[in-house]
Amino acid sequence: MAQSFSMVLNSSFTSHPIFCKPQKLIIRGHNLLQGHRINSPIPCYASTSSTSVSQRKSANYQPNIWNYDYLQSLKLGYADAHYEDMAKKLQEEVRRIIKDDKAEIWTTLELIDDVKRLGLGYHFEKEIREVLNKFLSLNTCVHRSLDKTALCFRLLREYGSDVSADIFERFLDQNGNFKTSLVNNVKGMLSLYEASFLSYEGEQILDKANAFTSFHLKSIHEEDINNILLEQVNHALELPLHRRIHRLEARWYTESYSRRKDANWVLLEAAKLDFNMVQSTLQKDLQEMSRWWKGMGLAPKLSFSRDRLMECFFWTVGMAFEPKYSDLRKGLTKVTSLITTIDDIYDVHGTLEELELFTAIVESWDIKAMQVLPEYMKISFLALYNTVNELAYDALREQGHDILPYLTKAWSDMLKAFLQEAKWCREKHLPKFEHYLNNAWVSVSGVVILTHAYFLLNHNTTKEVLEALENYHALLKRPSIIFRLCNDLGTSTAELQRGEVANSILSCMHENDIGEESAHQHIHSLLNETWKKMNRDRFIHSPFPEPFVEIATNLARIAQCTYQTGDGHGAPDSIAKNRVKSLIIEPIVLNGDIY
């Protein structure tokens, strides 16, 4: 696969007889990175500004639905110190409950699950790990009930413990199948279903668990269980917990938990207040990014492209919602906004000649070379150049690391992959599935996003990590494959209407001589296998710090969410809009008597 990928990238350029002399890098007003030299030649084309308008495509993207004035009008209603004081008091009470030594250990385990799903887990990482370590030290993950055994397994794997799936063998019959007597235990079946998505490649018992629970949970009759449990089953069948983005799940679970008769009032109020306070932080970040995006002026200049600041910000919240990651969210919002704009240049507006030129100039990272670009590409290149250089300058100033070569390599590789897809489109060439995917997991932009994300985390960088980033370690590649396959499942119809032929669905159909439904099944199967590989990659032989591992996994989760019912990024429907509103715009109603 690595060889195929190299061949794809090497085939992305066309040789030209005339070249511009490489120049030294320049940063706006900074000379910190002077001395880096460019080895790649720049093809010198004649001006492309006279290209006929009729040669350019139009995607007819829907307009932006979140305008500047609306975003600036958000009130940040829970940023007051009064709420912060109340939140600290509630959190201390939750901490006391978690650390209660008199509580039965399995009761505490269920409490931890509620704490995590309510969105409070990040406040109690130390306490949660202490409880889970008790289960490891006592070797007591096996319980007589299926639901508690599965819950223990899931939580331990979520926190990186390589607990064996063999603990489920006691629930098998003499033929190696799950006992039919388990079917009536809906809570246990649901718990096993959720646990099965933490499986590694080759864990047959968890594959059996997934097939067994999926079949029987889908067969449940509404009258057989209570409404809350039915709601939980339907929610899980729609998308399992392990593949959901944390903050949207917290909103849903808080509202569901509030209807439970056994709900803990302290947990519930702590979760509601925390959600609203985090939401105010997100709104503040969003307003700052809205001002940045308006100041960039790209949207009115490049009217053919998608204006998707809110959707880009939503991606970053899905990757890292915690207040401490404000700088990371803002940096990634800039990156993803530029990716969206430049993607439309390649997909919709640029001629092949212009795209080859733009790709080569980005690879050179030469500010002087942009003079040969058409006007719409000049503003795009300069926006990219200034933004990436500014991020690199901040890292050099604050961390002492020169990260520019890693950032520009990721951008260059992505644009080469963009260019390959543009060639396939114009040639009406349908590549073989493997050839397509070797290019497409790079073109989907995951490596650019995650490379920036790593450096925005401000970690102490090691040589091993830098090599892993440069070589696109599995923790960059696996989320990118999931991102790509989800994207194709959600956008293939619109892409076909635009005349794009390179798509995993079409390649799969053509190569295997199968119909669209069978191709979708194949892609979903590949998605599941990639998740299994990533589950192991998360903690086995990973050189990356844990926060980055979680952010990389969250990239796959936000991709699943965005493309679950269509193209939630390029053509957001009412479902996508409501997700944004529930996560970023609309607070949860609090108990007025308390505050």
UniProtKB/Swiss-Prot annotation:
Residues the entry annotates as binding (2E)-geranyl diphosphate: 306, 343, 347, 484, 487
Cofactor note: Binds 3 Mg(2+) or Mn(2+) ions per subunit.
GO BP of this protein: defense response; diterpenoid biosynthetic process; response to herbivore; response to wounding
Binding residues annotated for Mg(2+) 1, in chain numbering: 343, 347
Enzyme superclass (EC): lyase
GO molecular function terms noted in the UniProt entry: (E)-beta-ocimene synthase activity; magnesium ion binding; terpene synthase activity; tricyclene synthase activity
One cellular component term from this protein's GO annotations in UniProt: chloroplast stroma
Cofactor: Mg(2+); Mn(2+)
Chain residues that bind Mg(2+) 3: 487, 491, 495
EC annotation from Swiss-Prot or TrEMBL: 4.2.3.105, 4.2.3.106
Catalytic activity: (2E)-geranyl diphosphate = tricyclene + diphosphate; (2E)-geranyl diphosphate = (E)-beta-ocimene + diphosphate
Induction entry: Accumulates in response to Tetranychus urticae (two-spotted spider mites) infection, and transiently after mechanical wounding and upon treatment with alamethicin (ALA), a potent fungal elicitor.
Compartments where located: Plastid, Chloroplast stroma
Pathway(s) it belongs to: Secondary metabolite biosynthesis; terpenoid biosynthesis
Function, as annotated: Promotes the emission of terpenes volatile organic compounds (VOC) in response to damage mediated by arthropod herbivores (e.g. Tetranychus urticae), probably to attract natural enemies of the herbivores.
Domain notes from UniProt: The Asp-Asp-Xaa-Xaa-Asp/Glu (DDXXD/E) motif is important for the catalytic activity, presumably through binding to Mg(2+).
Annotated family: Belongs to the terpene synthase family. Tpsb subfamily.
Protein known as: Tricyclene synthase EBOS, chloroplastic
Lineage: Eukaryota, Viridiplantae, Streptophyta, Embryophyta, Tracheophyta
Gene: EBOS
